[in-house]
Amino acid sequence: MTSLLITGYKSFELGVFKDKDPKVNIIKKAIKRDLKRFLDEGVDWMIFTGNLGFEFWALEVAKELQKDYPLRLATLFPFETHGQNWSEANQEKLAAFKQVDFVKYSFPAYQSPAQFKQFNQFLIDNTDQAYLFYEPENETNLKYFYNMIIAASDYPLFRLTFDDLNEVMSE
């Protein structure tokens, strides 16, 4: 079994506020290209944490790829209460994260910032590699997870970058 953790920018961090935004198609095209490569290299589990934006788009692509690949999907939420205050439209996306092969949460509810560090460490310790849409120059809260991955020198990290998206756009 080879697992791939998938995470990255949230939609609002990319200035995407509608599902029909043209940026989403370009991002999904890049995701599909990359996920196929991971699948061809033997990845058979893709792990998500239930975030809107890059993760949700990757989940949509992964569900499409399940038709052609022996792929299993999992969502590991940081909290049981994850997404409970989201809008109705986003509740549908949350439901998609729950309609996978394996679903668990780490903590019943948020109590302290230390839980995020523990959750991130758990993800690194229990997955084989990560696929991350993040650039340190465009900093978000994802920087904490990114820095933990970098510190774990034996944990493979594959990044999608804005340059990659420009390449896909010009194809």
UniProtKB/Swiss-Prot annotation:
Pfam families tied to this protein: YpsA
Domain of life per record: Bacteria
HAMAP family: UPF0398
PANTHER family in alphabetical order: UPF0398 PROTEIN SPR0331, UPF0398 PROTEIN YPSA
Family, as annotated: Belongs to the UPF0398 family.
Name of the protein this chain belongs to: UPF0398 protein STER_0279
Organism of this sequence: Streptococcus thermophilus (strain ATCC BAA-491 / LMD-9)
